[in-house]
């Protein structure tokens, strides 16, 4: 587990809820792989989660990963909130059910297979990996398919 897989993810939605898409760019040893998908009625947060989940599910073995997102919801959720949610039986600090629990549980399971560092960048600020993931997510909404 010495080589690092760089992953850039983004989610997009036209309306919230509305048609949504997600995109991911994976970079490893000079090679790139792009992934994207869409749902007809979803939220931006669900698309952010799906981008990370599908990117991590694509990895064929345990890896060191640097995952970069422009979603504070995703980064804060996985690095800060998740352990508390699990300890409380998947309830928030206000004792409410965690939103998007199906995706958080799926992300928790797939993330446990890897050694991941989570990074946040401000969206639409010209970060090349984030811009490509954003373009994939927006294109997926228009094309409505998984690639």
Curated annotation (Swiss-Prot):
<dbReference type="InterPro" id="IPR050092">
    <property type="entry name" value="RNase_H"/>
</dbReference>
<comment type="subunit">
    <text>Monomer.</text>
</comment>
<dbReference type="InterPro" id="IPR012337">
    <property type="entry name" value="RNaseH-like_sf"/>
</dbReference>
<protein>
    <recommendedName>
        <fullName>Ribonuclease H</fullName>
        <ecNumber>3.1.26.4</ecNumber>
    </recommendedName>
</protein>
<feature type="binding site">
    <location>
        <position position="134"/>
    </location>
    <ligand>
        <name>Mg(2+) 2</name>
    </ligand>
</feature>
<dbReference type="InterPro" id="IPR036397">
    <property type="entry name" value="RNaseH_sf"/>
</dbReference>
<keyword id="KW-0540">Nuclease</keyword>
<comment type="function">
    <text>Endonuclease that specifically degrades the RNA of RNA-DNA hybrids.</text>
</comment>
<dbReference type="InterPro" id="IPR022892">
    <property type="entry name" value="RNaseHI"/>
</dbReference>
<keyword id="KW-0378">Hydrolase</keyword>
<dbReference type="GO" id="GO:0000287">
    <property type="term" value="F:magnesium ion binding"/>
</dbReference>
<dbReference type="Pfam" id="PF00075">
    <property type="entry name" value="RNase_H"/>
</dbReference>
<comment type="similarity">
    <text>Belongs to the RNase H family.</text>
</comment>
<dbReference type="InterPro" id="IPR002156">
    <property type="entry name" value="RNaseH_domain"/>
</dbReference>
<keyword id="KW-0255">Endonuclease</keyword>
<feature type="domain" description="RNase H type-1">
    <location>
        <begin position="1"/>
        <end position="142"/>
    </location>
</feature>
<dbReference type="GO" id="GO:0004523">
    <property type="term" value="F:RNA-DNA hybrid ribonuclease activity"/>
</dbReference>
<dbReference type="GO" id="GO:0005737">
    <property type="term" value="C:cytoplasm"/>
</dbReference>
<feature type="binding site">
    <location>
        <position position="70"/>
    </location>
    <ligand>
        <name>Mg(2+) 1</name>
    </ligand>
</feature>
<keyword id="KW-0963">Cytoplasm</keyword>
<dbReference type="GO" id="GO:0003676">
    <property type="term" value="F:nucleic acid binding"/>
</dbReference>
<feature type="binding site">
    <location>
        <position position="10"/>
    </location>
    <ligand>
        <name>Mg(2+) 1</name>
    </ligand>
</feature>
<feature type="binding site">
    <location>
        <position position="10"/>
    </location>
    <ligand>
        <name>Mg(2+) 2</name>
    </ligand>
</feature>
<keyword id="KW-0460">Magnesium</keyword>
<keyword id="KW-0479">Metal-binding</keyword>
<feature type="binding site">
    <location>
        <position position="48"/>
    </location>
    <ligand>
        <name>Mg(2+) 1</name>
    </ligand>
</feature>
<dbReference type="GO" id="GO:0043137">
    <property type="term" value="P:DNA replication, removal of RNA primer"/>
</dbReference>
